[in-house]
Amino acid sequence: MYEEGLLDTTGLLNAVAKDWITITDVIEIVGEDNALSVVMSAKLSEISNACNAVIVNGVDIKFGEENVHFNLSIEDQSNINNLFCVVELGGTEFPYQADGGVCRIYTAAEIAAIYIAAQTLITTQTTYHNELKQYVQTLTSAEEVSAIQYGMTLPEPYLTEMNEKLAVAQQQMQAIVGRMQQAAATNQA
């Protein structure tokens, strides 16, 4: 099926994931010279798709007693960014709709919380994905590459690099919150 073009390399790796065939079978099918590049290409695509799926799935936020879910498709991200711009420009509230909810008025503080939760998830996942991708690209066998799973603990130095980058992002989010609180206090005075 692979030779006839009916099955691509991703399909071969899916068959491995379902235990229908082994990596040894993939190597035999694509040839030893092509095995690493084929498996790596498919794995990089797989982890990219997994990263995107986690992001699009979105975030849950608790406002008082209410648990609210926000998907983070590209359109949703754009809407949330626009909401945050309203707050940055001095808006104190704005209507928006959580997934499965009705449109309601969110306060500036709630909009900031939505934005920060969304950006934190996006930054965490994309940073993790990029570090995992770098790690995968250092591997030298199809078997090693095939064993990689999105969500696994990163080995060093990738874990430290990710944590350092996320610490910078967290500091910036805290700076945003601080500036917003300062602006709100100034406006109330």
Kindly give the residue locations of the regions a language model identified.
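A preference for well-ordered globular domain cores
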Residues: 1-189
